[in-house]
């Protein structure tokens, strides 16, 4: 996916969306990039991405997590490297089935950084819907 930059010295320049992430990580490394907020519940999810160090549950109430641009980019890079290490290459399709959460975008960008195609599925889909959509992807 390519976007047109708006404003500043980059006006009119076309660059991949992953380059925006890398640019923001360089220019605004310590500024907040993503916020996850749910004031009514604590983090009780169990997810399989923990082995890659992408999940960092908190015990704060109200529940709020945030990550900076540099952390966002680092997590996307780590996930991309994991995928490449498992044989994912440009043009491959990678399904993403997970809850809406702070880790969703670093994982999505990690897929894009490999050159693969991200295929997000709604986590509410049943197995038949997942199979049907996977066949269409």
Segments predicted by a language model, with ranges:
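Conserved AMP-binding/adenylate-forming core of the ANL superfamily
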Residues: 13, 33-101, 105-109, 126-131
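Structured binding elements
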Residues: 115
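Active-site charged/polar residues at nucleotide-handling catalytic sites that mediate phosphoryl
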Residues: 135-137
């Amino acid at each position: 996916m390519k976007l047109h930059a708006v404003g500043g010295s980059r006006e009119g320049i076309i660059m991949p969306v992953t380059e925006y992430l890398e640019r923001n990580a360089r220019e605004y490394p310590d500024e907040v990039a993503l916020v996850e907020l749910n004031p009514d519940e604590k983090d009780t999810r169990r997810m399989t991405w923990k082995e890659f160090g992408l999940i960092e549950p908190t015990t704060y109430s109200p529940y709020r997590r945030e990550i900076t641009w540099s952390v966002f980019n680092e997590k996307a890079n780590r996930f991309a490297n994991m995928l490449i290490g498992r044989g994912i290459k440009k043009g491959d399709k990678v399904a993403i089935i997970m809850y809406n959460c702070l880790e969703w975008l670093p994982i999505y960008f990690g897929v894009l950084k490999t050159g693969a195609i991200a295929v997000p599925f709604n986590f509410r889909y049943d197995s038949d819907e997942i199979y049907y959509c996977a066949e269409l992807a």
